[in-house]
């Protein structure tokens, strides 16, 4: 791709500085990256606003010969004075990260155009729902891919990206590889961070699915309205040249608000709304136990379908119902979906049950790390009627601090005992995090244990379990690491529980 062709395609990008003796017609562009370490000579280094004061450092380290920055005469002029004159500087009026996805897609020939992409957004349930959809489609012979918190899956490949929604350049490369391997349908998680930062700009999305919206990420979003608008962004980037549709849980927190906003903005968009005001898709007759979950899903025309699944918890009633509606939207067979839901593979770190050797005690490992998710998982474990429920949790450091006391109140109210421990403390002092959590307990409430060492806390929690008791280990789920300071260490809640039970 010639530089001149790129500038014609993106008139919002202007040529700021060009080395003397060179012709823009002769400059070849291979790709665009926002990670300076990934750049090659003929790449564009996209200098995101979030880099802040380190722009000069990252530009110096980048191998890229082209640099894209936001228009700022002071910053650009300072850089032009000190940078190697062989660099080509491009400028734009907005955060370059918002253009990165469109440029990446353009340079790769728009790989997402040839894929059916179903994107799921929401505070809780994204990973479960995308994994359920992946299983349903795969069982019906569809070559499908999965992108999300647990990683990227397609064919026999599993890739850990480290992000729920990969950066725009990585995402487009993944989609290109999927297309080349014959993948036709992709189920992906769309995080609020990814949507707000423009990681999905330029991606052709056929369907948007919304699970719920409750408090989280207020360290990143200015308030809940900003968080909501970031989620709504998914429906603004739908590709209406495809058979586009939306799926949402009308009765979920902020579900009705989103429904009416979509309806006002896109009145012709097909919406499958679970438990909406017209009761077209109504859930009833819910049955929950440790053997599985069942319910009746009402369909249009006064029809009903009994849904049974091995997935546990009341939240999986909503997840499987949303998956069923999404499956209808993409043309999956109803009977085959019903059969597949009975035997969905265990989703790592989501209501994952581990029994002691004699099965007299159990632990549940779950990713719940928000107030709403913690309440849902505790209530779901309660449905199994354990003789004693001990909830072990912490809160991530350098993240939304306002949820800490809220999670304490929920744990105290719904559990028999509470253990406070570290999650990913990052650069905060673990004891300070526990202090802030503890402010949410009622006067006089004393947790069973307060231990910053998560492994020790799990061992103590297991040792305190009576026969018929359950330890809920919440917060990290599938994660196989713990971040202490700036160091990422191997750590797995599942492994620690298994060791505490003497299973290996």
Swiss-Prot record:
Its EC number(s): 6.3.2.13
- Grouped into one coarse class, the protein's main location is cytoplasm
Q: Which domain of life is it from?
A: Bacteria
- Residues recorded with modification N6-carboxylysine: 231
Biological processes per GO annotation: cell division; cell wall organization; peptidoglycan biosynthetic process; regulation of cell shape
Binding of meso-2,6-diaminopimelate occurs at: 399, 423-426, 475, 479
- Catalyzed chemical reaction(s): UDP-N-acetyl-alpha-D-muramoyl-L-alanyl-D-glutamate + meso-2,6-diaminopimelate + ATP = UDP-N-acetyl-alpha-D-muramoyl-L-alanyl-gamma-D-glutamyl-meso-2,6-diaminopimelate + ADP + phosphate + H(+)
Protein name listed in UniProt: UDP-N-acetylmuramoyl-L-alanyl-D-glutamate--2,6-diaminopimelate ligase
